[in-house]
Each structure stands twice: as structure tokens, then as C-alpha cells.
């Protein structure tokens, strides 16, 4: 039966619209911005998922373009964008004077800004809108201070008056935020990304931990997911951004350097790092522990039983088990055989366990007992031994799907940072790197004062173009309030007048005039504009106490 013309025309119009949208997306993807980006889907597949509403230019996309240019400039010049975790609009407004990016930390949000109002450690167990809401909080403050400054400068009646105000501050400093481990499966990752884009984030980072067992990057018990599973997360982030026509910057973080667990052994790239038992006479760890718990064992005694099981199990990586078997054998060319094996089975060879076992048997003439199921912990997770080379392997796998890669580490070890950078750049020479200048490190113990002074620049020479102190907002606030509370309790108003207000005057801190900083003059202007130029209730009229500071700032 022939299709009526009206229906045929509708179909043709629909296909023409999709074809046009797909062509526009392809043109967008052909821009230099995407030279290093790998996508696993077509422009048409994105076009059919955008809907009929005209594409929006989200503020996030504007800020993403800005931060990309900032980072690109640092990459070309061999310099560094340095920043730290901002807690609130006060900190953001002051950071804008000196820094070119802003960081929003999930750790800080977990302890100070959960949308459940329930504080806690950095386990990403707060509601998934917590960090996006903090981004929105800070982004709206940035916009407000930008509007306030713009109006003030627009009122200048001469170049001299404008010069007297000093250089304009770029309050619209791009925000890169913590997306933790995605707060669930791929649909959660998609929705979380959408929230960040809608709320003004220029970029987000996501780590390769499990979302159910997520820990702070400086806690024990970290469990990573298979390589491909995290790649799927990164693809989902980019897919969401593409659908929303956002150029969101993606930072791929790996926690594998100190990971001790992995959720699955499905990905062959992880096989080299999975720990197995080499004692065939050992019972499964989970059964062993369950039996002890059922018998009433707990606490320290349970820990002792676990240690005893581990010692008896002979836990090793497969290449270690192979080397031990070779060294125990009667073959004469032991080192040659071990080298032949290691040349084909290494941290970056992505050799499967099946292939490694086959090679081991060819070289040694027998099978080696190695079972990674026996040591599985009671939560069902496999034991894993990461390290720097593991992080290199994962960062290389993630690099095509992210703009920056980051290895979370336990110490500010420059040589380790060099090993990671060189390992990644051996495959991707222009790859951008990020580094966490963590306050979890004991910096005075880790290096000398002179080394502290040059650490950022030295990392920058290795390619770490974005570096950040995750919790500096938290720590500086705690220190300032601790010190002021102590002084105020002892010295009364002298503590505030001399140690706060006078220093604000000396340093030219704009919050000294907190009414003006808060936008009272700007809002007065709106009221007057709405009321024909006059407002009897203007906040900054005659009688405002801030007139006392006219000569100070």
C-alpha cells in the first residue's frame, strides 16, 4: 500500500533535519579542540538524541572553552595552572584575583556541603547532587560579582576614573569539579554529568574506583573497576556533553597506584596485577573467615587469623609465581627463561592470564598452580596489587577519552611523578597531566623548604599542567578560625581590629567593605532603576556605617 504524500514528506523532513544536525555535529568535531578525542559513536547517533528544542549554549560550555584555552596555553608555554578547593563564594571571589581555575572538592563537600546536611568522610555516600549544587552555588556567585564589577566600571566617566579602579578582575574563573566514581552505573554517570553541565562546571574528574566501595584517594581499602568499565564511564560523560552541545573538559583519574582490590577480572589488561594463591591446599579465604566469625571470633583475633591465612596462601602475582618456580627448578638457564617470560608478560603488555599460563608451561614444561579466586575477600572482590606502572597502563587506556589524566598517589614523590609522566607520554607525547598537591601528604616531612618552593614548577616541566590542593579551602578556613578564636578569647576586640580588620586595610582586601562586596550598591541600583531613579529604602544611602571606610579602600 503506497504511503500518503503527507506522511512521506514528514519522513523526508525528519531525515533531512537529522542529516543536517549530524553534519553540524561532524563540523564541530572536526575542530582542533577534538584532535586527541576518541568517540565510539557517530554524529548521527548524537543528533537523534538531542530532541527538537533548539540547542542551548550552556554557561558550562562557555566556561569549558575558556578552561581549555587556559590549559592549552599552559601546555604550550610549559607553565602550570595551580588552584585549590574552594569552600564558598568568599573564597572564590578572592581566588579570582590570583588564580586561573577553581577546584571543587568532593571531600570538602562531603564534610561541609552535603545536600542531606549530614557530614561525613569522603566516601561519596552523599546525595549525587551535592557537588553539582556546590558548583552552582559558586558559579552564581561568580556571575554576581562579575555583574557587580561590570556595572561599577561602566559608570566611570573617564579613562582616568577607570584607571583609578585598577585592573578588572576576571571573576568568571572556570570551575573543575569532583565527580567521584559516578555515583552508580552508566545512567547515573549520564545524569551526574548533565547536572554538572547545567550548573556551570567547566570540567569534571572521575576516578576508576567502584562507586559502591569508593574511598578518599588517601584512604586504605581502595577498589578499582576493570579498565574497560571506566572507559565506558568516560565515553558516557563525553556522550552526555555531546548531546548537550558542551565542550566539558574531562579529567580521568586512576586510583590504581595504591589499590588493593578490583571488582572483576574480566579485562585482560588487569590480569598482570591480580593477586593469586600459590598454595593448592588452602581453603577459600571467604569460607575460612565466615567459619571463624560463625565460631564467635572477632576483632584482633580475626585480624590474626587473616594474617595467618595470607601467610599460608603464598599470595603472589603470576609473574612472581613463575619466577619462583623457575628458581626452584633444575634448569640451568634460569635468568634467561625468566627474561623470556617477562619480555612477553609485563605491566604494559596487556597479556591475558590464559596467555601467560600457556607461555609459562612452554618455558617451564609444567603448569603452575595460581588461583585468584581463593583469596577473594568476603565482599567478593579480587585482590589487586597496583603501583605506578599499573597507573601508567590505565592512564594510557583512558587518555583517548579524556583531556587530562591523573594518578592519585600516597606521597609527593617527584621521581614517581616522573615515571608516570614518562610512561604516559611514551605513548601519548602531548597528553596533559594533572597532579593532586594533597594536604594528606606531610609536606614538611616529605621535602625541604627549597624543594617545596619549586615542586609545582618541576612537575610542570614534566607536563603536569593542572595542579591543585584539594582541601586548601578547608584547611585555611580551619587555621584562620582557630587562630582568631584563640586570639579573640584572649585579647577581645584588639584581636579583630588588629589581626583582621587592619590587615584587610593593609592588603586591600575588598571584603573589608562587606556591604559593597555583597552587592548592596548593585542591588540599590536595581531598586532605583525599577522606581524611576529614587529609592527611600536604598541600603547604601546616608547613614550606612560603611562610610567609615571611605579612606581605606
Curated annotation (Swiss-Prot):
Amino-acid positions noted as binding substrate in the UniProt annotation, renumbered to this chain: 105-107, 217-218, 253, 436-440, 470
Active site, per annotation: 216
UniProt-listed Gene3D superfamilies: 1.10.10.850, Phosphoenolpyruvate-binding domains
Catalysed reactions, as listed in the record: D-threo-isocitrate = glyoxylate + succinate; (2S,3R)-3-hydroxybutane-1,2,3-tricarboxylate = pyruvate + succinate
GO MF term set: isocitrate lyase activity; metal ion binding; methylisocitrate lyase activity
Places the protein is found: Glyoxysome
Binding-site positions, Mg(2+): 178
Subunit structure: Homotetramer.
Family designation: Belongs to the isocitrate lyase/PEP mutase superfamily. Isocitrate lyase family.
Protein name: Isocitrate lyase
Source taxonomy: Eukaryota, Fungi, Dikarya, Ascomycota, Saccharomycotina
Amino acid at each position: 500500500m503506497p504511503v500518503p504524500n503527507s506522511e512521506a514528506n514528514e519522513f523526508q523532513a525528519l531525515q533531512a533535519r537529522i542529516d543536517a544536525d549530524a553534519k553540524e555535529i561532524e563540523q564541530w568535531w572536526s575542530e582542533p579542540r577534538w584532535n586527541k578525542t576518541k568517540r565510539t559513536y557517530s554524529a548521527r547517533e548524537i543528533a537523534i538524541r538531542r530532541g527538537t528544542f533548539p540547542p542551548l549554549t550552556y554557561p558550562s560550555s562557555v566556561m569549558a572553552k575558556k578552561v581549555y584555552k587556559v590549559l592549552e596555553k599552559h601546555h604550550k608555554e610549559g607553565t602550570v595552572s595551580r588552584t585549590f578547593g574552594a569552600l564558598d563564594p568568599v573564597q572564590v571571589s578572592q581566588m579570582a584575583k590570583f588564580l586561573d581555575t577553581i577546584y571543587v572538592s568532593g571531600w570538602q563537600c562531603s564534610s561541609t556541603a552535603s545536600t542531606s546536611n549530614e557530614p561525613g568522610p569522603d566516601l561519596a555516600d552523599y546525595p549525587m547532587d551535592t557537588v553539582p549544587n556546590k558548583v552552582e552555588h559558586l558559579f552564581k556567585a561568580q556571575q554576581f560579582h562579575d555583574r557587580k564589577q561590570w556595572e561599577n566600571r561602566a559608570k566611570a566617566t573617564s579613562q582616568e576614573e577607570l584607571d583609578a579602579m585598577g585592573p578588572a578582575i576576571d571573576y568568571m574563573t572556570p570551575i573543575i569539579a569532583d565527580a567521584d566514581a559516578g555515583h552508580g552505573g552508566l545512567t547515573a554517570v549520564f545524569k551526574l554529568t548533565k547536572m554538572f553541565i547545567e550548573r556551570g562546571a567547566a570540567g569534571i574528574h572521575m576516578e576508576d574506583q567502584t562507586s559502591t566501595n569508593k574511598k578518599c584517594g588517601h584512604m586504605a581499602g581502595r577498589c578499582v573497576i576493570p579498565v574497560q568499565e571506566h572507559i565506558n564511564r568516560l565515553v558516557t560523560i563525553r556522550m552526555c556533553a555531546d548531546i548537550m552541545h558542551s565542550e566539558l573538559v574531562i579529567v580521568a583519574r586512576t586510583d590504581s597506584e595504591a589499590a588493593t582490590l578490583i571488582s572483576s577480572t574480566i579485562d585482560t589488561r588487569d590480569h598482570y596485577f591480580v593477586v593469586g594463591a600459590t598454595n593448592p591446599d588452602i581453603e577459600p579465604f571467604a569460607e575460612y573467615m565466615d567459619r571463624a566469625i560463625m565460631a564467635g571470633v572477632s576483632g584482633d583475633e580475626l585480624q590474626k587469623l587473616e594474617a595467618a591465612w595470607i601467610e599460608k596462601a603464598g599470595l603472589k602475582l603470576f609473574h612472581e609465581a613463575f619466577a619462583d618456580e623457575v628458581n626452584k627448578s633444575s634448569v640451568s638457564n634460569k635468568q634467561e627463561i625468566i627474561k623470556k617470560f617477562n619480555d612477553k608478560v609485563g605491566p604494559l603488555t596487556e597479556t591475558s592470564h590464559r596467555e601467560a599460563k600457556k607461555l609459562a608451561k612452554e618455558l617451564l614444561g609444567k603448569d603452575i598452580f595460581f588461583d585468584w579466586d581463593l583469596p577473594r575477600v568476603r565482599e567478593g572482590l579480587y585482590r589487586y596489587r597496583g603501583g605506578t606502572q599499573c597507573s601508567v597502563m590505565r592512564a594510557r587506556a583512558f587518555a583517548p577519552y579524556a583531556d587530562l589524566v591523573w594518578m592519585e598517589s600516597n606521597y609527593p614523590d617527584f621521581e614517581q611523578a616522573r615515571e608516570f609522566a614518562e610512561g604516559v607520554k611514551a605513548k601519548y607525547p602531548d597528553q596533559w597531566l594533572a597532579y593532586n598537591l594533597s594536604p594528606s601528604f606531610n609536606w614538611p616531612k616529605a621535602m625541604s623548604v627549597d624543594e617545596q618552593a619549586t615542586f609545582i614548577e618541576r612537575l610542570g616541566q614534566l607536563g603536569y599542567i593542572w595542579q591543585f590542593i584539594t582541601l586548601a579551602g578547608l584547611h585555611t578556613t580551619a587555621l584562620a578560625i582557630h587562630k582568631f578564636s584563640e586570639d579573640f578569647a584572649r585579647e577581645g576586640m584588639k584581636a579583630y581590629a588588629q589581626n583582621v580588620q587592619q590587615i584587610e586595610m593593609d592588603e586591600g582586601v575588598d571584603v573589608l567593605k562587606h556591604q559593597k562586596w555583597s552587592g548592596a550598591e548593585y542591588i540599590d541600583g536595581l531598586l532605583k532603576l525599577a522606581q524611576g531613579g529614587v529609592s527611600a529604602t536604598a541600603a547604601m544611602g546616608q547613614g550606612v556605617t560603611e562610610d567609615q571606610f571611605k579612606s581605606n579602600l
